[in-house]
Design a protein with these regions (language model features):
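Edge beta-strands of jelly-roll/beta-sandwich modules across compartments, strongly enriched
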Residues: 158-172
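Extracellular ligand-binding interfaces
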Residues: 69-141, 146
Length: 181
């Protein structure tokens, strides 16, 4: 009878080692791609104020004299139907987008859609759900995409008062976080 080349434990150790090496290579390639776009000036790292964004079915309380905001802050918005949109019109390499929006009622789903070059319509195939990283902070991880537009759906129920200050595109974060799964 022939002995197996590697025992089960050795094979498992080899598989884990190979996975770790592939993870590091993947992260280094991602760093290289990001650095390339950043050096070419094609990776926006900016905060976009609410006034600079286009909204649909998502209006500031100040736009209607009959609406009463929850407090005196001028950044309160109200979704006027169950499918409000916030649009960023621009292009660039986007890894992460962060929505600053504190909701007074449960928002349902908060999602981001992105357009790739040549597209005109947003599709479910290019949809990213938010991860709540702090109260009122929704982070979308696009995994590094060249986009020609973003659409954020800040809630999916309608009638939700939202303290909305804008979005951050590719916010700064420590380099080593790329290696954390």
């Amino acid at each position: 009878m022939r002995k197996p080349l590697l025992k089960a434990r050795q094979l498992l150790l080899l598989a884990y080692l190979l996975a770790a090496v592939l993870w590091v290579v993947r992260c280094l390639v991602g760093c290289g791609v990001m650095l390339n776009y950043k050096l070419q000036g094609k990776m926006p790292q900016t905060h976009v104020d609410a006034a600079e964004l286009v909204t649909e079915s998502f209006a500031p309380y100040s736009s209607n004299e009959w609406w009463t905001p929850p407090d005196d802050d001028p950044a309160w918005y109200l979704s006027t139907d169950s499918d409000p949109h916030i649009y960023w019109q621009g292009q660039g390499y986007i890894e992460t987008a962060v929505l600053d929006a504190a909701h007074r009622l449960p928002p349902g789903g908060v999602a981001l859609y992105y357009l790739k070059p040549g597209q005109t319509d947003y599709t479910e195939a290019q949809k990213v759900y938010a991860k709540v990283t702090a109260p009122g902070v929704y982070t979308f991880d696009l995994g590094g995409q060249w986009v020609t537009g973003l659409r954020i759906d800040p809630d999916s129920v309608g009638g939700v008062p939202t303290l909305f200050t804008g979005i951050d595109l590719n916010p700064l974060h420590p380099w080593y976080t790329r290696f954390v799964p």
